[in-house]
Design a protein with these regions (language model features):
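Core catalytic lobe of class I
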Residues: 1-194, 201
């Protein structure tokens, strides 16, 4: 999950968030700034901490926050800022609804050890998408460890359909939700391209 920097400009029609450290392109809608939605405690140029805010909100709602996982990118998006380091990681969170939950640690075991909490995975472009697409390798261990074959996978933000594609490849069913109507064709085409094994598709 990406994060953003705080840039409060009430009444000027500017975006509340100037820069997204996830893609260097994504901004919150202008209407947020026009409404003057200032978040308490945040100062100009503060890193908002959206991933952790979401994780803590889910925990407060009753979920169990079991682990944070670092997605380390060796080929991150370049940034022009000169007063901090270039952002090269994002967060994944392992959450559960109960204390006892399904987790197949052996399904994602590395050759000589159990999988660590820092995942080194390069970003990959998808030819038909003009936005950032996360790589299938990021989804594979999540689905392998968190579900069994014929289980149902839910992706509430479907985007280009990466999660659905991986779920289908691993013998799972899937449901995806996407507000942007234009992505429907992209999703169908991407899943339709899937032939043979997941490794062959990647």
């Amino acid at each position: 999950m990406g994060d953003s920097y705080y840039n409060y400009r009430p009444g000027k029609g500017q975006a509340l968030v100037k820069q997204s450290v996830a893609t260097n392109k994504q901004d919150l809608p202008d209407k947020c700034a026009r409404r003057g939605n200032k978040l308490d405690g945040l100062k100009e140029k503060d890193l908002i901490g959206i991933p952790w805010m979401l994780a803590f909100a889910l925990r407060a709602d009753g979920w169990y926050l079991r682990q944070d996982i670092i997605w380390n990118k060796s080929n991150p998006m370049p940034e022009s800022v000169r007063d901090r380091c270039t952002k090269s990681h994002e967060y994944l969170f392992l959450l559960s609804k109960n204390q006892n939950y399904y987790f197949d640690v052996d399904a994602i075991k590395e050759p000589t050890r159990r999988k660590r909490s820092v995942w080194n995975i390069n970003k990959k472009a998808y030819k038909d998408a003009h936005f950032a697409v996360y790589p299938p390798e990021l989804v594979i261990p999540c689905i392998k460890a968190g579900s069994e074959k014929n289980d149902l996978i839910l992706d509430p933000f479907m985007g280009s359909g990466t999660t659905a594609m991986v779920a289908k490849s691993l013998g799972r069913h899937y449901i995806g939700c996407e507000l942007h109507e234009g992505y429907g064709k992209l999703i169908k085409n991407r899943i339709g391209e899937l032939r043979g094994t997941l490794e062959e598709f990647i």
